[in-house]
Amino acid sequence: MNTEKPGGPFYQLSVDETLTSTNSTPDGISSAEATARLQQYGENALPQKAGKPAWLRFLAHFNDVLIYVLLAAALLTAVMGHWVDTLVILGVAVINALIGHIQESNAEKSLQSIRNMLSSEAVVVRQGNHETIPTTALVPGDIVVIRAGDRIPADLRVIEAHNLRVEEAILTGESTVVEKSTEALSGELPLGDRTNLLFSGTTVSSGGGKGLVVATGGDTELGHINQMMADIEKHRTPLLVQMDKLGKAIFIIILVMMAALFVFSLLFRDMPVSELMLSLISLAVASVPEGLPAIISIILSLGVQTMARQKAIIRKLPTVETLGAMTVICSDKTGTLTMNEMTVKAVITADKVYRVEGDSYEPVGNIHPIDEPDPITVAPGTLLERYLRTIDLCNDSQLIKDESGLWKITGGPTEGALKVLAAKVTLSPASTELRSKIPFDSQYKYMSTLYRIGNEETILITGAPDVLFRLCQHQQTDHGLEPLDQPYWEAKIEEYAREGLRMVAAAWKPAADGQTELTHQDLQHGVILLGIAGMMDPPRPEAITAIGDCLQAGIRVKMITGDHPQTAMSIGKMLGIGNAGNAITGRELEVMDDTQLSEAAQKFDIFARTSPEDKFRLVQALQSRKEVVGMTGDGVNDAPALKQADVGIAMGIKGTEVTKEAADMVLTDDNFATIASAVREGRRVYDNLKKTILFIMPTNLAQGLLIIIALLAGNLIPLTPVLILWMNMATSATLSFGLAFEAGEKNIMRRPPRDPKLHVMDGFAIWRVIFVGSMIAVSAFVLEAWLQPRGYSPEFIRTVLLQTLVTAQWFYMLNCRVADGFSLSKGLLANRGIWIVSGVLLVLQLLIIYAPFMQMLFGTEALPFRYWVITFIIGFVMFLIVEIEKPLTRKWRTA
């Protein structure tokens, strides 16, 4: 944010100094000056980058080496007049581009979501007059009138504050509202401690005042985040990178083979050029796994549907694959690992210490003496009842149940926590009447009310313990009054502060008969301390389990928060985060160079008092160490880091629209445990993708080998381009879906994340492709050699070869469904997808072999039943051979 001035940042300047530095006055600037500054600084709007038009994004999907092969093949077939081949090949290329374009249709809306956070109108003071203007017309030097419920329209320096409290959790991650004041601050302070600044996009919780505009548009803190989002280039997932490399390797192999065969055929075979070119086009089409991109997308989409049923919405398809490789989750604390609902966990009185059950705003939970297992019933007239009535009445918040049955509070979270505590017990009936009130203010750090309770006037007080200690001379017990034992209270405060609890004290004093007004002077004597509440934003119980699951799966969890280090470490220990006994702050991170930051990112698991830049840099530092990073969060402050992360995970209920749009995955139940389920599903999907790739590639190799053998031997072209495309786009794609429904392995969440550097086509995969592809090709070639001397037509022979390859594919799909063990196991019956795709495949083959219009289009002929039997036997023999190969090659395989 543009808060630096020659005299120091704006938060270090007094109100007068700030007015001087912005050339403004308490009455604001003139309309003429505002117009001039609008020309100088521009509109109070976030900069926008021009997006690519849809047609250009569509054409970009043709920028792929394998698509180049198809386009070249289409061009050559068109020149040769083979229009059916041309149209089919072009259709395949267009379908692949369309699938990629549709995937991209959820493209970046993050920046627009940030812009939507800006309010539309603001009340300003110009030349002493109040005016309502569009927020886009705000300029530095304007004075903005602030009221409860307003969304802050620009970055402001507070120049007037009346009990002003602001909700900044979306920006800083702090779960408590921030008290704002006009006083100048000293030292270098993180965002959350700049209590005299108001930030664009945050919301006024209560109170009001005025603020001087010190930054607009792209110069605001929100603008800074907007720029970070715009500058981030999203990483490609490991699988996509590997597919690119595989495509380029196939492209080079195709060029070399085509060149070699072209020269060989010209020199040693008397083959017409047109026939030779058609053979080479068939070879090119056969070598390209045209259906693979579409199949990968569809399998990922099926994984997306499964995750959606498990309450994880995947916004970007490749995220499904990346989840399986994730090694680190960087999680925001507030609202993600914790409830974002401040809850009282302990009550300290002069007589006893109590623990309080419950972890949310729902008013359910017993109160136990700290050393007793059984809960107590709060009796009328006891110290505890007086304490609970005090925190209930000296309170501006309300506890309500919304239409969906969720409990919520209005007002600040600290008062809300006290209100919930009081609602957990049934207080004895008493008539109450509020006579007077001193609202809470950060200047004096307490709130006080004057009530008539029954027939007595009573003054009730809640506030910071150190302030109430100065007001109190006595403490209340169940047996009467005692002198204040301040060392006892300070020891208890220190004890519970180490556990991350924030402390709020409560006190009372009798009021004078007939008193109707309350002043600060009334609180300077005779105040009696009742007790202290220790409260915290508690961990989500399900998050504790989820973190354990992640650790078991080899995924390290790191907590990144805007809270204080002691609070962060306490929460970290409760959650079971690995190195929760040590924390490092954003201030320490800021002075580190990249090398030091990289080491700190690996060493620490708790990062406190962090800014958006810190979170962003931490993700980058972990990625520099080759970690695959997931980042969870719900506030705007998390959005840049979410976008930078390999997997950005947003909260669906409490998350802002900005965060959701920046994320790759949105949890609809805000449940950290859903991440563990998503990781499990991501690993299952990747396993099935690898099985699918291993299934498809041997068929392409077999097709290519058949054509190469035919050219070398001077035989008939065994497969035309359209038949090859039928196998690659129809039968291969259909059968691949059967593998997509395979269940996950039993040890899927007990093995470490896979290494992204390991190629899906590892040594074993290459062996399997060559072994199976060669076996299929040799079988088909032998069958072709047997058929040719018997006078069958080329169309008949090609139809037999097509059925042979398709049947071999079907049996090999059964081989691929189980990496180890026999494929015809019980799981085969459980996977209904196998049988559905088998039925679809049968229908497709019947159509292409026996339907007249398909025969005309693809050049096939009807087959007698005995050829179905022959091809079935060939396929079954190959199935048995691969099953025998599995145990022999087990030691070569990678996990």
Give the residues covered by each predicted segment.
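Generic alpha-helical transmembrane segments
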Residues: 731, 776-777, 799-813
